[in-house]
């Protein structure tokens, strides 16, 4: 999931999502029954990259053999996939992580639930001036994203690698005021998309995986520190309306998305480390 300052919006009309008109009132639809026609196509809303790419790999290489008919609808915003899932206009979606979904459900009174983790787009600490973490000293400046989600992730990455110490009990949305010990470092908050452009002006910067790639940085090779996939709350997952996780088609897709074939596809396609597999249950 790539959180940016502005999202291109695909209209409901263009995607054929106007038939019921319920997307404008997502809380109007109750949870699913899990009793859908097993022979019907499973329609999944997804962001184009890597989500739709991964689903297309499953559709073209694994689904037919598994007896699953899969239809992928691409969305470039982060609202319609959930509203369309809640209203039943699509069966599932794959584009988001847990902190985002929790916030979305709370604000919109929706009942979307995660099914299974698939991948992570890791944040990394980068520098054009330092060669390793041990070179980061008091008095130097670190740039971090200024939005709540990515800012909190950045602080956790720094804390996990001993760069800073956070106060006890700081959750996923930590702020600079939650730092217990800055270890003499200065911090500069910037919009996530602009952080790579500041690399020449700071000593180090925490950059989202997608923005690192755009800046021609390789997470696997260039990052001084990189988020770990295991147990990461920012892993992107397959999600459905509550009750539909019992749908046999959903369970089959979840199995395929966590298959050795998909793991190999991710490894072979994203050798730069911008996308890594993060299989398993959502916690």
Question: Residue ranges of each PLM-predicted region?
Answer:
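Short, polar/charged alpha-helical segment
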Residues: 49-71, 90
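A bilobed periplasmic-binding-protein/Venus flytrap-type ligand-binding module shared by bacterial periplasmic
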Residues: 122-133, 234-247
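Extracytoplasmic "Venus flytrap"
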Residues: 27-28, 35-59, 76-81
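Periplasmic-binding protein-like
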Residues: 150-159, 257-277
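A conserved helix-loop-strand patch within extracytoplasmic ligand-binding domains
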Residues: 115-164, 263
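Bacterial lipoprotein signal-peptidase II cleavage site
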Residues: 16-36
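Short helix-initiation/N-cap motifs at beta->coil->alpha
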Residues: 72-83, 170-197
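Ligand-binding "clamshell"
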Residues: 103-115, 130, 201, 206, ...
């Amino acid at each position: 999931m790539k959180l940016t300052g502005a999202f291109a919006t695909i209209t409901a009309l263009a995607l054929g999502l106007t038939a019921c008109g319920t997307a404008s009132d997502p809380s109007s639809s109750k949870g699913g029954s899990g009793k859908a026609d097993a022979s019907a196509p499973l329609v999944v809303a997804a962001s184009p990259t890597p989500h739709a790419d991964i689903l297309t790999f499953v559709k073209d290489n694994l689904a037919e053999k598994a007896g699953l008919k899969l239809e992928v609808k691409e969305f470039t915003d982060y609202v319609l996939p959930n509203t369309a899932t809640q209203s039943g206009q699509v069966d599932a979606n794959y584009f988001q992580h847990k902190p985002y979904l929790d916030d979305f459900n709370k604000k919109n009174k929706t009942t979307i639930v995660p099914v299974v983790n698939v991948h992570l787009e890791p944040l990394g600490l980068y520098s054009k001036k330092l060669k390793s973490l041990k070179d980061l000293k008091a008095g130097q400046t670190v740039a971090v994203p200024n939005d709540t989600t990515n800012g909190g992730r950045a602080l956790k990455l720094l804390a996990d690698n001993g760069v800073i110490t956070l106060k006890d009990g700081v959750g996923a949305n930590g702020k600079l005021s939650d730092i217990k010990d800055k270890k003499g470092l200065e911090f500069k908050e910037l919009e996530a998309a602009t952080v790579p452009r500041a690399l020449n002006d700071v000593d180090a910067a925490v950059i989202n995986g997608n923005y690192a790639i755009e800046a021609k940085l390789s997470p696997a090779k260039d990052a001084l520190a990189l988020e770990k996939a295991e147990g990461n709350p920012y892993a992107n997952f397959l999600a459905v309306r509550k009750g539909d996780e019992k749908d046999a088609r959903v369970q089959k897709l979840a199995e395929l998305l966590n298959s050795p074939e998909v793991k190999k596809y991710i490894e072979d396609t994203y050798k730069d480390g911008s996308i890594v597999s993060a299989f398993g249950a959502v916690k």
